Amino acid sequence: MFRFVALAAALAASPPPPARPAFHAASAPLPPAMRAELTARGVWRPGCPVSLHDLRLLTVTYRGFDHRTHTGRLVVGASATRPLTTVFRKLYALRFPIRDMHFQHAYGPGSDVAGNDDVSASFSCRQAVPSPCTKGIATGSWSMHAYGLAVDVNPRENPYVGCGQTRDPRARPYFDRTRHRPGMVTGRLVQAFASVGWGWGGAWAGDTKDHMHFSANGH
């Protein structure tokens, strides 16, 4: 009895676990160094549907696969900053894990390093990627990523699929969407994007589904 009372007293005297850091978000014009890097890497170039002045650096708090709090940076269209702040605030509250949201891993020299291909990112001046059902490499139309109005979330865990195929063979373990694993898109994540009017590629009609992809117009 004495040992039980002593243990209870010790537990009562223990400090509470540290509070989880509060969510933080901020947006700003792209710094000159980032503009230069995006241009040097060909992520932005003359002829893109938006200028560098139309893009913003969105900094948000997110929860990693290590259960820790991290700071991520996304290059997004100016009009996307407010809705995406709302979305990532909800994802942080839901404790939804994101593998990586590091600027250098998405756009810098680190983007060429093996293992840095599970990065959640937004802007990329490129055409929409054809369905894995085809062998094509371009569609002839701009992707919503080219406007900074789309986000890919955990690409490895949420592959772009069609006709039983994907363009990332390492994502094959995630073909089975009925067996949930950390980082896979959930209904609550879809609802978070839907609350700001953004659609999900996993809800496209037909066989082709882009499970990672969320955009302002649903395409």
What positions do the PLM features span?
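Secretory targeting and sorting signals
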Residues: 1-16
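Active-site-adjacent loop/helix surface patches within enzyme catalytic domains
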Residues: 102-145, 158-160
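N-terminal post-signal-peptidase region of extra-cytosolic proteins
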Residues: 40-46, 69-78, 135-138
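Post-signal peptide N-terminal regions of Sec-secreted extracellular proteins
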Residues: 16-27, 49-51, 81, 196-197, ...
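N-terminal module-boundary/linker segments of secreted carbohydrate-active enzymes
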Residues: 14-68
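Catalytic cores and adjacent binding grooves of peptidoglycan-active enzymes
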Residues: 135-219
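Structured segments of extracytoplasmic/periplasmic soluble domains
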Residues: 63, 86-97, 126, 156-159, ...
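Active-site acidic/histidine clusters and adjacent loop/turn architecture
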Residues: 50-118
